[in-house]
């Protein structure tokens, strides 16, 4: 298995743990407070943290499984919805459309970035 695929699976697992944990592991590590979520940049209409997380993970997934990119895109869209719906039943978490929009926007941005990279590489 290529190193990019191993990296993708490890980051995907870490992402799932952080996303499904009841509270913020990063908030606990940085602020000693499970209820405080670190904010990379201010939110606009969507959650910027979710955009960054899904964008980075999607880029790694698309690079790792380039020949199956359609399935990777479906996986991340499905994962976006399922993880956000799971927040309905996880203590100290809540379903928010702004988070869901941020998740999907991160996937879309990663697709755009990859397509630009491919286009510029063909010139």
What are these regions (language model features)?
Residues 1-98, 104, 108-123:
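Bulky hydrophobic segments
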